[in-house]
């Protein structure tokens, strides 16, 4: 079964590059920052399962999930 998801984008609007395909600690951390629990390295970029379009940009994800009131 195909799981929906997205490639998250960093502060520069680029996908996160990764070198270790499949299980990837860096990608898992990236996906947590973007508000989802799991992700992995696919085609040399981090892919996050169940990542919604609204949270693809790290700026949007930070606004949606950070508890810090700065910028609100």
Swiss-Prot record:
Pfam families: Toxin_3 (PF00537). The keyword Disulfide bond applies. It comes from the Eukaryota. It is found in: Secreted. Transmembrane segments: none annotated. Expressed by the venom gland. GO terms for cellular component: extracellular region. Keywords: Disulfide bond, Ion channel impairing toxin, Neurotoxin, Secreted, Toxin, Voltage-gated sodium channel impairing toxin. The keyword Transcription does not apply. Gene3D superfamilies: Knottin, scorpion toxin-like. Disulfide bonds join 18-41, 27-46, 31-48. Its main location: secreted. One of its GO terms (molecular function) is toxin activity. Belongs to the long (3 C-C) scorpion toxin superfamily. Sodium channel inhibitor family. Beta subfamily. Binds to sodium channels (Nav) and affects the channel activation process. Has the structural arrangement of an alpha-helix connected to antiparallel beta-sheets by disulfide bonds (CS-alpha/beta). This is Toxin Acra II-1. The lineage of its organism: Eukaryota, Metazoa, Ecdysozoa, Arthropoda, Chelicerata.
């Amino acid at each position: 079964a195909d799981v929906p998801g997205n490639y998250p984008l960093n502060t520069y609007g680029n996908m996160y590059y990764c070198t270790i395909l499949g299980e990837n600690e860096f990608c898992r951390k990236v996906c947590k920052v973007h508000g989802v629990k799991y992700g992995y390295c696919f085609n040399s970029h981090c892919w996050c399962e169940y990542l919604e379009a609204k949270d693809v940009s790290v700026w949007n994800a930070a606004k949606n999930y950070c508890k810090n009131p700065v910028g609100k």
